[in-house]
């Protein structure tokens, strides 16, 4: 090549490398940074960002690793260690994106109160508000009616004219007879009664006209018949009165004839009833005497059988009295019990007294 060689160029005309810049500032042989984002505590160190001011920063971790590998390879070739620049925005220059470092003293300690708290990685979201219960207004509100310009409001009459005819119509006036109560059942029954009366009246008129047509019956005939009926009724009433008077006379005569016979009949009935009572009393005495003698023999023969039969006889007398009387009579019941005990237990008392 015929061009000028690098060796022949003046030191001010050729470009200066990073190693030369670091060597001039006395950073050759400085220890390498362990982490990419950690700063050195040496105040004499000069970063590449301070030297170049036009190197963009890439936030991609993969790109950072590639850049770090290339930097180490370059250091191995030239024997210099370069301080890694801080991560900045890819669209901003490095000088503009330098983060302010905390002040460090000579011993490498950061004084308290001079370092601000690190900002969070992600921006904070706004706090959640409690949801209100109940109905809420929707985000999409209903369109308001067109009321025209605020400065020139539209009259209500014009708004009413825009409404539909159905909304603007008024109901029909109420008829005056609408409040009158209507009895459907009563009207139907009355209509049926009217029809029945009309039909009956029509039949009666037809019958009367037919009778007058064929028999010649007129109003004079009806009056004559009524007069004749009145005379006949008067005659029958007079005859009835006469008959009643005759019947009364006959009844009094018959009563005078039959009164002695009824007296004899009533006397005979009373005598018959008395004789029946006497006969029943005699039969009762005879029956009681026979039972007394029979129980006397039973008590002598077998007292157990006599005792059972005496109980049965007493119960029989009580039942018989209640059947004959057919009423709740405690006196008759007590008399029956006393008579039964006297007939059945009397022989036992006599035998014990004599023996």
Swiss-Prot record:
The chain crosses the membrane at residues 275-295, 301-321, 330-350. It is found in: Cell membrane. Its main location: membrane. The keyword Membrane applies. Keywords: Cell membrane, Membrane, Transmembrane, Transmembrane helix. It is a multi-pass membrane protein. To M.tuberculosis Rv0497. This is Uncharacterized protein ML2433. It comes from Mycobacterium leprae (strain TN).
